[in-house]
């Protein structure tokens, strides 16, 4: 008789309670991952095709393929105006802000859509703060088992150690062997070599790819420096006859993938002032730099004794465009943002081996985004997902 009865909470309240518990604890990573694909160009095109006016404007832009690779002659200026008018009609559609992702499926299709919607940019009207790629947060930690390096001599250089770590990792080893075979001197076919290089730097874990390419060497260790310089198989990957840098850039701009990677590099490795203030974080600049490897604009270390990088091209014969050509050269060889990003990554790699981790597997998470809203949420044991809601629900009865 002394007991009081209270009605059970409605089912909707219970569901809301469970969701409120689950989202803060475990949804941080999944939401960040899902949001990366909210407005991909492939999805935006599907939305556009559902609207007759949008579909017609997009199809008209699709017929303007000639404007995607070269400026139009004067007699075709009317066609160019029509293309730009169609692009203007799409400014209120989701296509105008769509982006692609570096490791997405059907990346080539996505980039084709992007450049169809932005024909003016493909003609050289480059906006340095706009990249076709959405800048996402890297959430996977670096995991390496240094104990497996005991088979190497203690004084082995770090480039050899990173190469061994790749060899001991099935996926990295498979991808590295694929481009090694395609880029070998006997079988060298440059287009196949470049394709396999792109595959390696797109599919291998960043920890392995960056470790191989950006391994630090002692100044006097020429063997280590040569191993680092040969990482991308330059004898096959780089042009046999050194082209003019502006011609190389024009060739790159004619290809949607190369154009996109160059645009990404310009966006994230661009010094904004004479003091060398960089537009974005070092991790983004490095990712954009690695994205160029395997394209016509593949850069590399110029020697085995330093860490200066450059394009494999020359400015001889540039005529009135000499200054523009030299500026393009300096965007790699004397770029303060790129220089410091490479130096910082090499310092990080050196620190990994400076501690006594020989008997353990270490995991390092580098913060890739300064926006607190995009930072990774702490992962709690899965047990908490089942226990906490039950405890809280029990108090309601």
From Swiss-Prot:
Residues 1-28 form the signal peptide. Receptor for artemin (ARTN), a growth factor that supports the survival of sensory and sympathetic peripheral neurons. ARTN-binding leads to autophosphorylation and activation of the RET receptor. One of its GO terms (molecular function) is axon guidance receptor activity. It comes from the Eukaryota. Glycans are attached at residues 92, 145, 306. This is GDNF family receptor alpha-3. Keywords: Cell membrane, Disulfide bond, Glycoprotein, GPI-anchor, Lipoprotein, Membrane, Receptor, Signal. GO terms for biological process: axon guidance; cell surface receptor protein tyrosine kinase signaling pathway; glial cell-derived neurotrophic factor receptor signaling pathway; neuron development; neuron migration; sympathetic nervous system development. The gene is Gfra3. Disulfide bonds join 48-54, 159-215, 166-172, 183-193, 188-236, 217-224, 245-313, 252-258, 269-285, 278-337, 315-325. It is a lipid-anchor; GPI-anchor. The lineage of its organism: Eukaryota, Metazoa, Chordata, Craniata, Vertebrata.
């Amino acid at each position: 008789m002394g007991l009081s009865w209270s009605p059970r909470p409605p089912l909707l309240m219970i569901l809301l309670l469970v969701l409120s518990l689950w989202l803060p604890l475990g949804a941080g990573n999944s939401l960040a991952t899902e949001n990366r694909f909210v407005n991909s160009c492939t999805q935006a095109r599907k939305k556009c095709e559902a609207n007759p006016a949008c579909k017609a404007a997009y199809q008209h832009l699709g017929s303007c393929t000639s404007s995607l690779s070269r400026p139009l002659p004067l007699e075709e200026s009317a066609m160019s105006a029509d293309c730009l008018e169609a692009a203007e009609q799409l400014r209120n559609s989701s296509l105008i802000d769509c982006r692609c992702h570096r490791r997405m499926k059907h990346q080539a299709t996505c980039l084709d859509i992007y450049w169809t919607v932005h024909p003016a940019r493909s003609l050289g009207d480059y906006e340095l703060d706009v990249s076709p790629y959405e800048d996402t947060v890297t959430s996977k930690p670096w995991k390496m088992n240094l104990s497996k390096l005991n088979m190497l001599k203690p004084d082995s250089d770090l480039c050899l150690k990173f190469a061994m770590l790749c060899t001991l990792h099935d996926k990295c080893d498979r991808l590295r062997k694929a481009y090694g075979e395609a880029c070998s001197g006997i079988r060298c076919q440059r287009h196949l070599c470049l394709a396999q290089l792109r595959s390696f730097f797109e599919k291998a874990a960043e920890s392995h790819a960056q470790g191989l390419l950006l391994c630090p060497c002692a100044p006097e260790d020429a063997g280590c420096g040569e191993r680092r310089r040969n990482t991308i198989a330059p004898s096959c990957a780089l042009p046999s006859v050194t082209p003019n840098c502006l011609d190389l850039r024009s060739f790159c701009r004619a290809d949607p993938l190369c154009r996109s990677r160059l645009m990404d590099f310009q966006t994230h490795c661009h010094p904004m002032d004479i003091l060398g203030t960089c537009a974005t974080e070092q991790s983004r600049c490095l990712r954009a730099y690695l994205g160029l490897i395997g394209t016509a604009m593949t850069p590399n270390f110029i020697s085995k004794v330093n860490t200066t990088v450059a394009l494999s091209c020359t400015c001889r014969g540039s005529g009135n465009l000499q200054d523009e050509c030299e500026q393009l050269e300096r965007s790699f060889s004397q770029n303060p943002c790129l220089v410091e990003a490479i130096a910082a990554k090499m310092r990080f790699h050196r620190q990994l081996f400076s501690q006594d981790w020989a008997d353990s597997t270490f995991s390092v998470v580098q913060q890739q985004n300064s926006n607190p809203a995009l930072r990774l949420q702490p992962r709690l044991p899965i047990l908490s997902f089942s226990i906490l809601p039950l405890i809280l629900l029990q108090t309601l009865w």
